[in-house]
Regions:
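Charge-rich, solvent-exposed alpha-helical interaction surfaces
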Residues: 28, 65, 131-134
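Exposed beta-sheet edge and beta->alpha loop/turn motif
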Residues: 91-197
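Short low-complexity stretches enriched in small and charged residues
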Residues: 20, 54-64, 118, 126-130
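Bacterial Sec-dependent N-terminal signal peptides
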Residues: 1-24
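Short, compositionally biased low-complexity segments
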Residues: 3, 36-43
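Hydrophobic, Leu/Ile/Phe/Ala-enriched alpha-helical segments that form helix-helix packing faces
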Residues: 33-36, 66-73, 135, 163
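Short solvent-exposed beta->alpha transition segments
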Residues: 26, 42-99, 103-104, 110-112
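Short, aromatic-enriched amphipathic alpha-helices that serve as compact interaction elements
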Residues: 21-39
Length: 197
């Protein structure tokens, strides 16, 4: 009887610990993205960017990229805080580092000057079709629409981020996309990137 109670308590504590770890990852991932949405790029990168990624693309360069993307006069770009679909913790540490995969969806809106400032309806429609095709090829056919009312492309993206932590408290995040696999392999374990193949 004591053995059964011990096993039940041990199982319960393992499940509770795993759930709390997932909650920490979710909260920190949402905080990271909230900082990006608020355009506090420097703080987002200081707190949550993977050090290995910043060796390839320094923080200052990333801040410039974010600034350019969000302040480009030829387009208005906005992101919403993502919706976390699932967090999968990697079962064992790799070189004393804990890993998890965060699967999420995120909506973004893009207003392009080429569409808004088109000289006539024909040019506007041509530009809409051009950009719509480009967005659909990148994000998938059913994930992009053009909203005539506000002249914006509305995009729903589905992505994966890799979370890593040395001690399980402070997590760092790297958005992992298929076209970046070779770069990501430079600082993330290959087995973590299997979902991108």
């Amino acid at each position: 009887m004591k053995k059964i109670i011990y096993i039940l308590l041990l199982s319960w504590s393992i499940v509770t610990f795993a759930q709390s770890n997932v909650k920490v990852i979710e909260n920190q991932f949402l905080d990271y993205n909230q900082l990006i949405v608020k355009k506090d790029f420097s703080k987002a990168l200081d707190q949550y960017a993977h050090e290995g990624f910043l060796k390839f693309v320094p923080k200052e360069t990333m801040v410039l990229i974010f600034d350019k993307m969000f302040n480009d006069p030829s387009m208005k770009f906005s992101l919403e805080v993502p919706t976390i679909l699932k967090v999968e913790e990697y079962p064992q540490k790799i070189q004393n580092i804990s890993y998890a995969k965060v699967f999420y969806s995120q909506k973004m809106s893009v207003e392009l000057a080429d569409v808004v400032n088109a000289k006539d309806a024909e040019e506007k429609q041509k530009n809409i079709n051009l950009y719509l095709g480009a967005f659909k090829s990148q994000f998938g056919d059913g994930n992009v629409v053009f909203n005539e009312k506000n002249n914006q492309f509305e995009v729903m993206s589905y992505k994966m981020a890799v979370a890593n932590s040395n001690e399980g408290k402070n997590w760092k995040f790297t958005v992992a996309e298929k076209q970046q696999v070779e770069l990501l392999k430079q600082f993330l374990p290959e087995e973590i990137l299997n979902d991108l193949k």
